[in-house]
């Protein structure tokens, strides 16, 4: 991968000039000038997904200049580097190969000259065998009863991805009850343990090193709770499995290493749901549906790695994001799924994007003088409409939005879905085109009211519009289409990281807080006053000690 400061490229300079021409052009102007705009600025993927990016403040010239930027930053070379197993995560000297985990073509992918696919397939086969034994009831707990509940204990990528996917694919789930514990706050594990029976519960401990503080604290509490009922430590092996690479620590915990599912250092945490970390997904929806999830992602991988930039969906979405973030000064992006099963999708890509591209140092080790990753947030529609859409419509911040919805619902109850989708379509239209003062006044006239007598309220009913959106319409949310959608966003994030010259696949920003927490923890063991920190931290610790009693 080349390390190119994007602001020093000819394309960036051209974009800056182009922005001066575009900054006052409205989306309404663009549609008025081109009645065929939708067909030019939308694309369908695999007859499963329609991406409409026509309601953006862009022209064909904008996209051409953004694609020039991608070329100058050697995006094509970076894509080849990732897919070929080059160690593009240079700060940790690791390859980045989540694409290998879903490589359904089985073409060899090499790391240090060794094809990783045989190992990937071996772990998948092991996950299949294990999950089938649990789901069928063949696997028995220590009292001879079948498993009814699965508790996934992990944090970050070991929790967010599996939780998001099992929720999104709830229509495909079997009889097993799924629970997820992540927070080191004892409330989280306590509340889950109240719901389950030690005789019929399987715990999955998801930690690559088997040393993650939050995960291992929760795992030991789960083990203690289990042994209060089971008594004999030998029973742990029937009720705990590990998603890890530390066989020694797994064995010491009491887990049979035959039930340890490994993954590799070329699997980043926030890209790990495709690996053994996805065992909870397999247990929830079955192995065949998990393979469909992998297949959908693989189809998007092929699209991303082989399609020219001008038709490449992850690249187009990435470039449009850079346009807003760096030229219009938009600091955030909202992800708004109009599907209640997708209620964790925005949270998942909040981590996916912000932990990947929330960096202020470039690949050369220099502090950047441009914007890198945006703030990602969002909630399902229509809930968000009654919460924060006010600011998106009439606030002073530009918030580019991705609206996501399925054409076919899993719950065809009365006319619910038509009402939901009418809101989905209406919101992007309202954001793009707004409502002028003239229209507001005419509405008053149509009601038999004199606008002049209502002058005081008219300005508050005006919508400027010109708020940009993408619309992603899925035929239906299935394991395949969800896999493709997740991969679409993953590759968008990668593309932005390449162009913005940052390392997308490390996360050093999480380390300092952990180091300081490890230093502070021993100081909380007694009641002595602390004076070893700044006055604020000392004051907080000392008040905590006084209040806890």
Swiss-Prot record:
One annotated GO biological process: gluconeogenesis
Subcellular location(s) per record: Cytoplasm
Superkingdom: Bacteria
Keyword terms of this UniProt record: Acetylation, Cytoplasm, Gluconeogenesis, Glycolysis, Isomerase
Keyword Transit peptide: no
PTM annotation (N6-acetyllysine): residues: 80, 228, 234
Enzymatic reactions: alpha-D-glucose 6-phosphate = beta-D-fructose 6-phosphate
Active site per UniProt: 355 (proton donor), 386, 514
EC number: 5.3.1.9
Record-level GO cellular component terms: cytosol
GO molecular function, one term: monosaccharide binding
Pathway: Carbohydrate biosynthesis; gluconeogenesis; Carbohydrate degradation; glycolysis; D-glyceraldehyde 3-phosphate and glycerone phosphate from D-glucose: step 2/4
Keyword tRNA-binding attributed: no
Family: Belongs to the GPI family.
Function: Catalyzes the reversible isomerization of glucose-6-phosphate to fructose-6-phosphate.
Protein name, as recorded: Glucose-6-phosphate isomerase
């Amino acid at each position: 991968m080349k390390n190119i400061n994007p602001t020093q490229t000819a394309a960036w300079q051209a974009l800056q000039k182009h922005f001066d021409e575009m900054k006052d052009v409205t989306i309404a102007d663009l549609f008025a000038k081109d009645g065929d705009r939708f067909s030019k600025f939308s694309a369908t993927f695999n007859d499963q997904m329609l991406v409409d990016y026509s309601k953006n403040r862009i022209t064909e010239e904008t996209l051409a200049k953004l694609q020039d930027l991608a070329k100058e930053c050697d995006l094509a070379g970076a894509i080849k580097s990732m897919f070929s197993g080059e160690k593009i995560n240079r700060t940790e000297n690791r390859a980045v190969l989540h694409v290998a985990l879903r490589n359904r073509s089985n073409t060899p992918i090499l790391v240090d000259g060794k094809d990783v696919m045989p190992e990937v397939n071996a772990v998948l086969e092991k996950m299949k065998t294990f999950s089938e034994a649990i789901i069928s009831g063949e696997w028995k707990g220590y009292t001879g009863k079948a498993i009814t509940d699965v508790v996934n204990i992990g944090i970050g990528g070991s929790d967010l991805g599996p939780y998001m996917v099992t929720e999104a694919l709830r229509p495909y789930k079997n009889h097993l009850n799924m629970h997820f514990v992540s927070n080191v706050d004892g409330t989280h594990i306590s509340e889950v343990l109240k719901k389950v029976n030690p005789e019929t519960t399987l715990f999955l401990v998801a930690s690559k090193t088997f040393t993650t503080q939050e995960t291992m604290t929760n795992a030991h509490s789960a083990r203690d709770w289990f042994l209060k009922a089971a008594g004999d430590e030998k029973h742990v092996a029937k009720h705990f499995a590990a998603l890890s690479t530390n066989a020694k620590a797994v064995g010491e915990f009491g887990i049979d290493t035959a039930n340890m599912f490994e993954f590799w250092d070329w699997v980043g945490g926030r890209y790990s749901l495709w690996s053994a970390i996805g065992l909870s997904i397999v247990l929830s929806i079955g192995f065949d549906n998990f393979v469909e999830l992998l297949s959908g992602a693989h189809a998007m991988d092929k699209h991303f790695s082989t399609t020219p930039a001008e038709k490449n969906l992850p690249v187009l979405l990435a470039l449009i994001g850079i346009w807003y973030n760096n030229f219009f000064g938009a600091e955030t992006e909202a992800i708004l799924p109009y599907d209640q099963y997708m209620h964790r999708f925005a949270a998942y890509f909040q981590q996916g994007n912000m932990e990947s591209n929330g960096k202020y140092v470039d690949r050369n080790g220099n502090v950047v003088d441009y914007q890198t990753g945006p703030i990602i947030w969002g909630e399902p529609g229509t809930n968000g409409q009654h919460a924060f859409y006010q600011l998106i419509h009439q606030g002073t911040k530009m918030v580019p939005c991705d609206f996501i919805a399925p054409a076919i619902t899993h719950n065809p109850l009365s006319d619910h879905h038509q009402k939901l989708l009418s809101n989905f379509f209406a919101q992007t239209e309202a954001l793009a085109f707004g409502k002028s003062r003239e229209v507001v006044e005419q509405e008053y006239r149509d009601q038999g009211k004199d606008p002049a007598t209502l002058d005081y309220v008219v300005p508050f009913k005006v919508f400027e519009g010109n708020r940009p959106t993408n619309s992603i319409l899925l035929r239906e949310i299935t394991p395949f289409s969800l896999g493709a959608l997740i991969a679409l966003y993953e590759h968008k994030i990668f593309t932005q990281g390449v162009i913005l010259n940052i390392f997308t696949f490390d996360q050093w920003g999480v380390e300092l807080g952990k180091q300081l927490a490890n230093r502070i923890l021993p100081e909380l063991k007694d009641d002595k006053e602390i004076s070893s920190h700044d006055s604020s931290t000392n004051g907080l610790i000392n008040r905590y000690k006084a209040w806890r009693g």
